[in-house]
Amino acid sequence: MIPGEYLCADGVIEINPGRERIALDVVNTGDRPVQVGSHVHFPQANAALDFDRAAAHGCRLDIPAGTAVRFEPGLAQRVSLVPLAGTREVYGIGPNPPGKLDDPEGEQ
């Protein structure tokens, strides 16, 4: 083995198996490209991205960990989102992070 080398299993590796998915159309209304990483709470992504933020609440991009999607200015593209897992708490991404996503009292 070489230091830093990846040894992957044979066959197809499924990302987020069995997870519910939603598809949303996103348009970059800004004048420069925007990249969104794999674990960003998608509704808190750059304000220049136009999409249904309410529908995306509690979700992240359905892409491999450590990767990102690039949105070019003026172009529309469809993305697949999956619900955030784990404790479903979001802090520090933007000025008004939602906190506990499943809090019955609403956002904190």
Swiss-Prot record:
Question: Is Transport among this UniProt entry's keywords?
Answer: no
Judged by the first EC level, this protein's enzyme class is hydrolase
Q: Tell me, which GO biological process terms does this entry list?
A: urea catabolic process
Write out the annotated subcellular location. Cytoplasm
The record's listing under CDD domains reads: Urease_beta
Q: Which Gene3D superfamilies match?
A: Urease, beta subunit
Q: Which reaction does it catalyse?
A: urea + 2 H2O + H(+) = hydrogencarbonate + 2 NH4(+)
Enzyme Commission code: 3.5.1.5
Pfam families of this UniProt entry?
A: Urease_beta
Provide this UniProt record's keywords sorted from A to Z: Cytoplasm, Hydrolase
SUPFAM superfamilies, per the entry: Urease, beta-subunit (SSF51278)
Q: In which pathway does it act?
A: Nitrogen metabolism; urea degradation; CO(2) and NH(3) from urea (urease route): step 1/1
What InterPro entries is this protein classified in? Urease_beta-like, Urease_betasu_sf, Urease_subunit
Naming one, the record's GO cellular component terms include: urease complex
* Principal localisation: cytoplasm
One GO term in the molecular function aspect is: urease activity
Q: Which family does it belong to?
A: Belongs to the urease beta subunit family.
PANTHER family in alphabetical order: UREASE
Summary of subunit composition and partner proteins: Heterotrimer of UreA (gamma), UreB (beta) and UreC (alpha) subunits. Three heterotrimers associate to form the active enzyme.
Q: Which HAMAP family does this UniProt record tie to the protein?
A: Urease_beta
Q: What is this protein called?
A: Urease subunit beta
- Please tell me the species this chain comes from: Nocardia farcinica (strain IFM 10152)
Gene symbol of the encoding locus: ureB
